[in-house]
Curated annotation (Swiss-Prot):
The gene is prmA. This is Ribosomal protein L11 methyltransferase. Keywords: Cytoplasm, Methyltransferase, S-adenosyl-L-methionine, Transferase. It comes from the Bacteria. It is an enzyme of class 2 (transferase). SUPFAM superfamilies: S-adenosyl-L-methionine-dependent methyltransferases. One of its GO terms (biological process) is methylation.
Amino acid sequence: MPWLQVRLAISPEQAETYEDAFLEVGAVSVTFMDAEDQPIFEPELNTTPLWSHTHLLALFEGGTEAASVLAHMELLTGGPLPEHHSEVIEDQDWERSWMDNFQPMRFGQRLWIVPSWHAAPEPEAVNLLLDPGLAFGTGTHPTTALCLEWLDGQDLKDCNVLDFGCGSGILAIAALLLGAKQAVGTDIDVQALEASRDNAGRNGIADELFPLYLPEQLPQVQADVLVANILAGPLVALAPQLSGLVKSGGRLALSGILAEQGEEVAAAYAQDFDLDPIATLDGWVRITGRRR
């Protein structure tokens, strides 16, 4: 049986209003999807986890008229709808279809990110087991790719790595699987630290190899390698602190930076690091360098 699917681009603040309205006009299901690939972690009880840019998908039984649904929605919500799209889709195995959307991804020469339900394409490669979802997004965001590709190209043997803003732990876990001696993770979100611990366990990484801290608990480490995939503003503000956490001769990789923000972030680190040319991917950049 075919279904009518209506997709709306919404903000988190609009979620409850539009969810209730869709159910009121007869939707058999309402789901939320990440519109950009932003990590988001397990929510507190009685809260709805949402991304800053979210797609709401409402599913209706076949034969439902899209124009009628949209007209009733505007009446219920009191105004024009946000950007939207409707289409008729054929019935299918929805769980299988969702899983099929996420295939193993290769970063650099050695590293693969592999969903748990999929066989590793190259069993002898470095395979990081990580399922897409709340703790990871799809994994295709350019900032993540830039950092993973950089790590894949480094000699990490016997290195101590610091993942500042570790989120799901993907960068630290990748570093350990690529040969790092130890990785330290820190994040402002306790739930992110829990996600990192869970993902490390899936990859056979012992707790002592990947200690995790809130920022105020972070010891004064001297890292051989520091990675920070956060945002340009915090990277600039934290430049003195982050620079101080890298030993002389140590390496730095920063991302979460839009192309137009690259020069500002680079300038904040230029006095302490010999910087490489800025790497760019799909409007995002990565800044790397070596501590003087």
